[in-house]
């Protein structure tokens, strides 16, 4: 068997395959391992199984075996632990490898990795499609100063100038952050957050554009049975007496830029336009994937892209709803508190275009001297007539005997004699417009238009005058629901006025 064919099936870098064009004898172990990763090429065969779509984003720390990847059961050792993943080549023919259980159709990947050392030892992290599109990141153990980037389109190896080398500080001794951003218009390779290479989709050598799975593993490019070109590229012949050779992966982040359950080749053109997303769309979650990646790269977590979108939407809706409710409540409270509309009128009905019903204003009076039906209503004539909560407003009294005094947070003067010290509560509760009137200490609250009957006034005034006739200068103390106490002394003239009003009411 040709080593070129063997390496292609193994999904190893096509750059390596280029140097392996010469014939060589492959071992039975290598042949068996190679056949286990063989896939159906939809550009050459019909009826290939659709590719399972990732259609989400995730971060994997490999503290235990991962649901996202399958151990290909090649010879070698794979361990999981608190420090992440280790893949060890302990002897000849070992080739520990993990393959993703999903495909992405464009996406972004990040790996925190320390490459294996050792002459001829190759550490690999790459994307590959069923029709042999490929995007690579590779390290050779004998070179502790750089890593390599490469790409291929449809397995085309007619030219060999696709690979590039990038300087990096001791990659076999230190962990570094390597990132691939495979977008529709370009692919970008990053080292520790810095762009080191950009490939445009207008490349004359083609551009990867079909669904790809993720592979990672370690193998011996310097095996003495390999072609001379492969051994040279890998840095020389591998000395297995120096084994074991281990590569380490601390974390992997993967995002898919597309949505759907499966990706299918619609024809044999191999173009991205021919790819069909079952139940989704190509590039349908690009923006969401960027958000997911940012969260995951900063140590955050998400359950899935759909959950993330739903959560963001729900959160936004909740925030808006909360803000609106808070604003309405605050506005209503502010309106009632700042409206100084002490009004003396005949069976007057105070109305408002506002539908807010702060009917929970439950001020109580310890000593009610002029306890007419002092009514708090959410129906304020207009927001435009509001004054600040600390403002005072003088309202002329009416000649009628029936009074409706709208409660206010600050004293207001009626005919320059009577002052109301009744203030509505500043805390609003959700009470429907048809909720019953709450009466505490002679202060009635209702969201309906309020009227004060002659009988109510007469009764209340009479009762009040009798209970407080001995108190010439008593304090009218009002207990507001938030615990604040306000007290004002009612002038003597005010009492006389109250008596006069009560007598008129009896006529």
From Swiss-Prot:
Factors inducing expression: Positively regulated by cell integrity signaling through MPK1 in response to cell wall perturbation. Induced by heat stress.
Homology family: Belongs to the glycosyl hydrolase 16 family. CRH1 subfamily.
This protein's name: Congo red hypersensitive protein 1
Propeptide, chain numbering: 483-507
Temperature-related behavior of activity: Optimum temperature is 37 degrees Celsius.
Sugar-modified residues: 117, 177, 201
Catalysed reaction equations from the record: Random endo-hydrolysis of N-acetyl-beta-D-glucosaminide (1->4)-beta-linkages in chitin and chitodextrins
Listed PROSITE patterns: GH16_2
UniProt EC number: 3.2.1.14, 2.4.-.-
Keyword Transferase appears in the UniProt entry: yes
Secretion signal span: 1-22
GO annotation terms (biological process): carbohydrate metabolic process; chitin metabolic process; fungal-type cell wall organization
Topological category with respect to the lipid bilayer: Lipid-anchor; GPI-anchor
Keywords, alphabetical: Cell wall, Cell wall biogenesis/degradation, Disulfide bond, Glycoprotein, Glycosidase, Glycosyltransferase, GPI-anchor, Hydrolase, Lipoprotein, Membrane, Secreted, Signal, Transferase
Misc: Present with 44000 wall-bound molecules/cell in log phase YPD medium.
Lipidation (GPI-anchor amidated asparagine): 482
Any GO MF annotation of the entry: glycosyltransferase activity
Region Disordered, residue ranges: 329-368, 381-478
């Amino acid at each position: 068997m040709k080593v070129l064919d063997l390496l292609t099936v193994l999904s190893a870098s096509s750059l390596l395959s280029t140097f392996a064009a010469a014939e060589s004898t492959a071992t039975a172990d290598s042949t068996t391992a190679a056949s286990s990763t063989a896939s159906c090429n939809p550009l050459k065969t019909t009826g290939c199984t659709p590719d399972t779509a990732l259609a989400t984003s995730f971060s994997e720390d490999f503290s235990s075996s991962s649901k996202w990847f399958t151990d290909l059961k090649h010879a070698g050792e794979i361990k999981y632990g608190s420090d992440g993943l280790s893949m060890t080549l302990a002897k000849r023919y070992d080739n520990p490898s993990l393959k993703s259980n999903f495909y992405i159709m464009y996406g972004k990947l990040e790996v925190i990795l320390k490459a294996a050392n050792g002459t001829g030892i190759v550490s690999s992290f790459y994307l590959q499609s069923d029709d042999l599109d490929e995007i690579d990141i590779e390290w050779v153990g004998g070179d502790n100063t750089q890593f390599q980037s490469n790409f291929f389109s449809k397995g085309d190896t007619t030219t060999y100038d696709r690979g590039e080398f990038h300087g990096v500080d001791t990659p076999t001794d230190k962990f570094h952050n390597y990132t691939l951003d495979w977008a529709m218009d370009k692919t970008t390779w990053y080292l520790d957050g810095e762009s080191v290479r950009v490939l445009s989709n207008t490349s004359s050598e083609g551009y990867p554009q079909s669904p790809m799975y993720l592979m990672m593993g370690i193998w011996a490019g310097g095996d003495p049975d390999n072609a001379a070109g492969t051994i040279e590229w890998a840095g020389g012949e591998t000395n297995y007496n120096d084994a074991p050779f281990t590569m380490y992966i601390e974390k992997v982040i993967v995002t898919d830029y597309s949505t759907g359950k499966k990706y299918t080749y619609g024809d044999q053109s191999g173009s991205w336009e021919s790819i069909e997303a079952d139940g989704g769309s190509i590039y349908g979650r690009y923006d969401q994937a960027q958000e997911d990646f940012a969260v995951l790269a900063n140590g955050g977590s998400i359950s899935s892209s759909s959950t993330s979108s739903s959560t963001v939407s729900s959160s936004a809706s909740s925030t808006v709803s909360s803000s609106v409710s808070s604003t309405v409540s605050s506005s209503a409270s502010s309106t009632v508190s700042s409206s100084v509309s002490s009004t003396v009128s005949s069976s007057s009905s105070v109305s408002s275009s506002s539908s807010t019903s702060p009917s929970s204003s439950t001020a109580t009076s310890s000593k009610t001297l002029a306890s007419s039906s002092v009514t708090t209503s959410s129906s304020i004539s207009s927001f435009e007539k509001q004054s600040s909560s600390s403002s005072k407003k003088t309202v002329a009294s009416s000649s009628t005997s029936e009074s409706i005094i709208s409660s206010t947070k600050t004293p207001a003067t009626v005919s320059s004699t009577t002052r109301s010290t009744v203030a509505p509560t500043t805390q609003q509760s959700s009470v429907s417009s048809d909720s019953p009137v709450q009466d505490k200490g002679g202060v009635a609250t209702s969201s309906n238009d309020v009227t004060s009957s002659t009988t109510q006034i007469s009764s209340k005034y009479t009762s009040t005058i009798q209970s407080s006739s001995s108190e010439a200068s008593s304090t009218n103390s009002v207990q507001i629901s938030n615990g604040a106490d306000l007290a004002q002394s009612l002038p003597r003239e005010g009492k006389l006025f109250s008596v006069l009003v009560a007598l008129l009411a009896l006529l």
